[in-house]
Amino acid sequence: MQQLILASSSPRRQELLRQVGIPFVVAVPEVDEHAVHADSPAELVERLALRKARAVSVRYPGAIVLGADTIVVVDGEVLGKPADRAEAEWMLGRLSGRSHQVLTGVALVRGDEELVAHEETVVRFAPLSREQIQWYVETGEPMDKAGAYGIQGRAAALIASISGDYYNVVGLPLHRTVQMLTQFGYPIFTGGAG
């Protein structure tokens, strides 16, 4: 079977691939995410995912490299990972009682072959009190996540609704990723369920 390399240090992306039984090796890309610019959030996540996959692909010729990048967008403003607790509180205040978009870019690279797409999910937070925001920030959970929350963790108690791919919000849209891997000739649905 062809080797799949995950160009990400995200434990959530690793867990999602394990969940569906896709074997992979992790290789952390060295990419300056702040140096990437785009005209739209969708274009931004696709460019970032592709840049990550390309950065790792040069070290693994012949392998399929999977890169991904997730952002949160509210009122057209991109919210990345908070720099500190104050910024996490500010971000959660922005999301309180409102809908926002979560976009994940997914890129596959094998040599000169490239495939890029993105997924968008709409998430609505319940109205949050200052105490709820402080409680959540004090857990430490928001600090390494785009938009300062992890839907798969304690923030689940703060979410009013979701429209779209739940796994996209976690960090990797599994259905789209599997479709892309299949399109790339990676055999996912063959053999036994061993």
UniProtKB/Swiss-Prot annotation:
SUPFAM superfamilies: ITPase-like. The active site is at D69 (proton acceptor). The record marks R12, T70, Q152 as: Important for substrate specificity. Keywords: Cytoplasm, Hydrolase, Nucleotide metabolism. One of its GO terms (cellular component) is cytoplasm. Pfam families: Maf. It comes from the Bacteria. Its EC number is 3.6.1.9. GO terms for biological process: nucleotide metabolic process. It is found in: Cytoplasm. Its main location: cytoplasm. It catalyses: dTTP + H2O = dTMP + diphosphate + H(+); UTP + H2O = UMP + diphosphate + H(+). InterPro entries: ITPase-like_fam, Maf-like. Its cofactor is a divalent metal cation. GO terms for molecular function: dTTP diphosphatase activity; UTP diphosphatase activity. Nucleoside triphosphate pyrophosphatase that hydrolyzes dTTP and UTP. May have a dual role in cell division arrest and in preventing the incorporation of modified nucleotides into cellular nucleic acids. Belongs to the Maf family. YhdE subfamily. This is dTTP/UTP pyrophosphatase. It comes from Symbiobacterium thermophilum (strain DSM 24528 / JCM 14929 / IAM 14863 / T).
